[in-house]
């Protein structure tokens, strides 16, 4: 009888101990829209690019599997805002975007600069100094509150294009004077889309006009939206605290820079 009682007490203790342990969050699967923004994002890049890999790794640490669905630039964010996909990433917050999207902690920051032709520089101390400059703008992108204020005031003249490479071609042809883009992305696109004799005609300004935070966004009406944001933030912190974040950035950047396709004759 004593043996039975001891066995029952032991079994009860095991059950109570198991119940007291925190349960692992159930595994979730989500789809995020992606686009071509190398070396941070890109379908043919190793790991889909630096930012794509960081997003996947951070979610994985919180039991979330991520699949990517690629869209043209001007449809990437819209697909998240209307719920076609669960979310997207690589976006800075604006009041308009916050109406439809939940924002995580920033993953990386983009150093936004103006690219120009080497033979036509545009120095400035304030964006209002660029009065009447023709500035290429990619449809769907946000270039800071100050940039928008200068456009509204008529100090900057926006010239729209569907993607960044088209804007760089327009800059090379003299159809625009300046093109704002992340320093690393601009240099990557120029090196991989233009012959050296053309690439050397374009240069970035040294001064950045904005350091843009790049967030993951989740459709605001998603029934697990707040949970997904919390899981991502937790996974991102774990990635950063472990030192894996910096290792992944360095490894993926090196792999992305080593990757290239032949440039078509121009």
Residue ranges of predicted features:
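Bilobed "Venus flytrap"/periplasmic-binding protein-like clamshell domains
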Residues: 39, 45-57, 118-153, 167-169, ...
């Amino acid at each position: 009888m004593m043996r039975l009682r001891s066995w029952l007490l032991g079994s009860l203790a095991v059950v109570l101990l198991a119940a007291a342990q925190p349960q692992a969050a159930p595994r979730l699967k989500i789809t995020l829209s992606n686009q071509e923004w190398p070396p941070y994002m890109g379908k043919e890049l190793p790991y889909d690019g630096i930012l794509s890999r960081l997003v996947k790794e951070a979610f994985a640490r919180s039991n979330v599997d991520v699949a990517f669905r690629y869209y043209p630039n001007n449809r990437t964010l819209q697909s998240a805002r209307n719920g076609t996909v669960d979310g997207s990433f690589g976006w800075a917050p604006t009041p308009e975007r916050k109406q439809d999207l939940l924002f995580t902690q920033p993953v990386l920051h983009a150093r936004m600069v103006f690219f120009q032709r080497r033979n036509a520089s545009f120095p400035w101390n304030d964006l209002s100094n660029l009065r009447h400059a023709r500035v290429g703008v990619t449809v769907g992108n946000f270039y800071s509150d100050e940039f928008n204020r200068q456009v509204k005031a008529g100090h900057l003249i926006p010239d729209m294009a569907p993607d960044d490479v088209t804007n760089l071609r327009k800059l090379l042809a003299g159809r625009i004077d300046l093109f704002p883009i992340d320093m690393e992305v601009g240099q990557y696109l120029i090196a991989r889309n233009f012959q050296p004799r053309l690439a050397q005609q374009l240069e970035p300004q040294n001064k950045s006009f904005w350091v843009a935070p790049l967030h993951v966004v989740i459709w605001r009406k998603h029934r697990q939206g707040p949970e997904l944001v919390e899981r991502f933030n937790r996974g991102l912190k774990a990635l950063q605290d472990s030192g894996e974040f910096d290792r992944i950035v360095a490894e993926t950047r090196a792999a992305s820079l080593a990757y290239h396709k032949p440039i078509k004759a121009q």
